[in-house]
Amino acid sequence: MGTNKIPKTLNGNLVLILIITIMMVTHSHGFQLEIRNELSGRYRKLVYKCWSRDNDFGWRQNWPGQYKDWSFAISLFHTYFYCHFRTAYGRVDKQLVASWELKQECGDRRKCTWVVKKDGLYLRQWKTKFFSNKYGNERWNVYIEHDVLKKSWS
């Protein structure tokens, strides 16, 4: 009498629900997906449409030097974006997967950049290069971009 007990049906499930809730809160950080037009030459316009299960971003148009980015939270599993890219050089249909693994591949914890160039669709990776002076008492780092071709125009 007077003791508060958790009902037996919730005892194990309550702990499981609590753990899943904590994991979802700690694993849903903000993230950006960026599409950048770096086409050169006469035919430089990029037209694309991207959508996910929850959102349709519609058709967009970028000229060289322009970019578009979307911010969202990565779920505990994966967030899938599908995009149709159209240029005078060809077209690419690509599934852009926003996941924890892709964040590692991009080299940036907050943003993944997809770059459209004359020969295809690239994923921009950021590498950190460390420097120090000859005495070793001053250190600094520089972020270097490196584009990896993921899909050629068809």
Curated annotation (Swiss-Prot):
InterPro entries: Self-incomp_S1. It is found in: Secreted. One of its GO terms (cellular component) is extracellular region. Keywords: Secreted, Self-incompatibility, Signal. Pfam families: Self-incomp_S1 (PF05938). One of its GO terms (biological process) is rejection of self pollen. Belongs to the plant self-incompatibility (S1) protein family. This is S-protein homolog 12.
